[in-house]
């Protein structure tokens, strides 16, 4: 009897529904190829949640997610909702509460450049020849984004804005284990990012990470200040395997690493809780400027679905098959507009045609 997994499908706004449709078609192909069944329940989130149910994260959506084994998330946001109070806007009103409700503390963002796409990168060919594969692991529920106190006080020109950067030993320990366990399955290197020369929270971070590293003698640990890391990512990204960051540093460096690949439309992400539950989403935004035109790149959404198979459902072979199918399609020259360079052998395709090609390769 086929194993059954429950998936909460949250397409969201902008290009979200279009790229989600292709990911679900690839999921159909996985069902046909492997002895497994995916029960999918769609729910509103972000701007769609605001328009249809009055808030970015409706209670119905939360309940659907609670009943699921994983969340497959599209993208949220757009100009239509930018005039709302910040806490009610799609991004802050949906993503931050989802992370808190489900304890999604570990964000995994691969920054991969395929050898056939090195020309799309902003870096020189000699720096990235042969491609690179970096995994940024970001602590997602602590640090300056969440710690108290924070706020704005006073009147007029006497107003003061303040935030608190705070980390506990258990918070640092659990994200460090995620990084070292990931490195064991990759290049066996962890570079921990901090600002221990000026921040007390970073002093503790470095101390705890160094202690945990002793449990993983087969993995090489290095430390790097965040300003140097930002420079080194551009100078020589191949030096990195797994990059371990606290929340704000990871937010910044993961975007930088992503852009080195040439397109955010290529990059998946996973946000994991303790256990097997996770939320999987593309690294890019809702791209409202191209929504509805059928030209969005669905690869990030499809690879995010592949990460769901690997991390929440233990289907490593299926996840690898999806990764290989994407690489095959790129080697065959299929390109959506964002990665099209008008080179010989390239074939410009739309969203659905890219999905068709990946399904055929799978």
Curated annotation (Swiss-Prot):
SUPFAM superfamilies: Isocitrate/Isopropylmalate dehydrogenase-like. GO terms for molecular function: 3-isopropylmalate dehydrogenase activity; magnesium ion binding; NAD binding. Binds 1 Mg(2+) or Mn(2+) ion per subunit. Its main location: cytoplasm. It is found in: Cytoplasm. The keyword DNA repair does not apply. Substrate binds at residues 99, 109, 138, 227. Its EC number is 1.1.1.85. Pathway: Amino-acid biosynthesis; L-leucine biosynthesis; L-leucine from 3-methyl-2-oxobutanoate: step 3/4. NAD(+) binds at residues 78-91, 285-297. Mg(2+) binds at residues 227, 251, 255. One of its GO terms (biological process) is L-leucine biosynthetic process. It comes from the Bacteria. Homodimer. HAMAP family: LeuB_type1 (MF_01033). This is 3-isopropylmalate dehydrogenase. The lineage of its organism: Bacteria, Pseudomonadati, Thermodesulfobacteriota, Desulfuromonadia, Geobacterales.
